[in-house]
Amino acid sequence: MSTILIFIAALLACSLLAIWRFRVKSRRGSLPWFSAFQDAQTRKLLPEERSAVENYLDNLSQIQQVPGPTGASAAPISLTLNAESNSVVILTHSITRYGITTDDPNKWRYYLDSVEVHLPPFWEQYINDENNVELILTDTLPLVISLNGHTLQEYMQESRGYALQNTASTQASIRGEESEQIELLNIRQETHEEYALSRPAGLREALLIVASFLLFFFCLITPDVFVPWMIGGAILLLAAGLWGLFAPPSKSALREIHCLRGTPRRWGLFGENNQEQINNISLGIIDLIYPAHWQPYITQDLGQQTDIDIYLDRHVARQGRFLSLHDEVKNFPLQHWLRSTVIAIGSLLVLFMLLFWIPLDMPIKFTLSWMKGAQTIEATTVKQLEKAGVRVGDTLHLSGKGMCNIHSGATWSGQSNSPFMPFDCSQIIWNDAPALPLPESDLVNKAMALSQAVNRQLHPKPEDDSRVSASLRSAIQKSGMVLLDDFGDIVLKTADLCAAEDECVRLKNALVNLGNSKDWNALVKRANAGKLDGVNVLLRPVSAESLENLVTTSTAPFISRETARAAQSLNSPAPGGFLIASDEGSELVDQAWPSTPLYDYPAQEQWSAFQRLAQTLMQTPFSAEGIVTSVYTDANGTQHISLHRIPDKSGWWRYLGTTLLMLAMIVSAVYNGIQAFRRYQRHRTRMADIQEYYESCLNPRLTVSPENLI
């Protein structure tokens, strides 16, 4: 067992480590510079290069302290070397720049695709269409240490005053010779509504939640030793799924948005299609990328100075007064109907598994009784139990004397599973009525009398009275023959037992042949008239054995039928009282099991065995304890109480967990099913509602009051 626990603990630790590494890698992958530089070559930073970088950063910090033309100092750029700064990233790429309005003598921002980098201002004149760039990573922006063969080591040999001057240079050759000035108003983080547009739809989190539901289900059917581990795993999966769906984004996950002011213009030909027209709008040298559904509304801002918020990848988040992704999500929330569908389907799956694999009757009853506050009842008499007022969910501890029940209408056979058949000691009849008398039967007495008469004559004993002298009997025995010395008695006892014509047919025919009579009725008349008194019949041993077997087979049905009838006659308890039953079929009496089941006895022995069993079980001590699962009163006034064994602590938790899981799955399936339907309907009309909203904002309809028309 310890090996299994160690293995599970190691597996859990490895899983947590793998998740942590995956999160670290995904966090690195979410950084804007990682995807841009991941295919670049790298090398180690040389000591002289590091010295040049440190000197440049020192001079940069000194220059930033010098007030500008308006008397304000430049905003400090915190470039600090870190452990990753020892690796130089080498790549060939174009450099994009745009201007800002600031007191900083360096009025340009430089980008490699969507990654902003810090370029020493004295290298602006060396920018080409494709640039050989070497840079290192700092705590804030990547720092360019070499551009097209120019390095910071050369800068150390030149005048320090020249280093950060506003050098007169030509425009970057990437976008042409001239570009319009763009004013950088602000740099902000995207709002939660804007972040929601790039956030996944939550399908992965929905699958995690469904996986947690399945783990909770398997907790109900696995051994106790694994349950804590599975519950812990299910809680972790559920927490991870809910956190992914509802947790606010971290600050590091929110991307930067640059708030710009400039004049957007369209550069293109008249023959371009709609998609090309929406993608050929520029703000200065920045090519803007608009949402597709903004196409009808962006033309009114062309050629006019407009406030535009963009991501570093040039996607527009806001333009003008009305076009805003933030307002879209706020007024028309995203409808993630797919994740609700997945959770609803998963909940239904677990619910069906509960219905088909786990009995739900007992968990529901136990949970409801536990919530209602069930009572514990101890009783040793019928009156005590009557006063207690038994309800479903109560715990009973009963002891006393009662009768094992006999089911009505049952077919008593050897295949029945009760060791006390025909009595069922998993059900006890408990009342104050006097015990029933032992059953009696005239037919059984007649059958036994016939069997005894034949047996006495076929197997005589020396002390038995006989109408034949001892010497004659001895001579007959020596000859090998068998003597019936009272044949008339056998005929009369057979007629008394088998009164109907269709009963004991073979035995009657045999006796007719032995009596040398015309038919059975004639033979009976002769016997009644005393004409068979003193008639002796000699039989060969084979004939004697056949006669004995015929008597046995003829009397057996009478005895078996009377045994069953007598058992049914005992199934008539007095009105009132209780019938205490174990719904698991457990025996409620402490009696030794019979060595041989009743119906395994020969027919001639069943009656005596039944009487012994009845004498023991009609008034026998019993003890019963358990939780009441059902209570009802029959037409005879007997109160039927079904008991289930008292579960242990683990069983209680399983019952409670089964009920809670079933209720949770029902609520989850209904709620998420309704949400999926409603969200799907809203998702289909969301884009049309957004366009209608923009139409009402950009092209308002004026309604004229009828009073103004007068």
Swiss-Prot record:
Main location: membrane
Cytoplasmic side: 23-204, 247-339, 678-710
Protein name per UniProt: Putative membrane protein IgaA homolog
Parts of the chain that traverse the membrane: 2-22, 205-225, 226-246, 340-360, 657-677
Subcellular location: Cell inner membrane
Statement: the UniProt record of this protein carries the keyword DNA damage: no
Protein's membrane topology: Multi-pass membrane protein
Membrane-side (Periplasmic) residue stretches: 1, 361-656
The encoding gene: yrfF
GO cellular component: plasma membrane
Family that this chain belongs to: Belongs to the IgaA family.
Protein keywords: Cell inner membrane, Cell membrane, Membrane, Transmembrane, Transmembrane helix
